[in-house]
Amino acid sequence: MKFTVYVKPNSKKVFFRKEEDGVLTIAVREPALEGKANEAVIESISKEMKVPKSKIRILSGQKNKKKIIEIDL
């Protein structure tokens, strides 16, 4: 399964929200430095969707706020 995620790093509030256009918005506290925000996004998706972190990967957008995520089901 593939989907688009918009990430808000360095956020005061942590949330996981589906927008009207179908894009997920994930806010994480970690900064967008050295992949910390990406790790937090994967962990957030893992907890929210109850999927092991090893099954989640970022296909594109490693250094961008807009990412395409793939989950192996």
Curated annotation (Swiss-Prot):
Species this protein is from: Leptospira interrogans serogroup Icterohaemorrhagiae serovar Lai (strain 56601)
Q: Give the disulfide map.
A: none
Put simply, this protein is called UPF0235 protein LA_1736
Q: Which family does it belong to?
A: Belongs to the UPF0235 family.
A Pfam family this protein belongs to?
DUF167
What InterPro entries does the record point to?
DUF167 (IPR003746), YggU-like_sf (IPR036591)
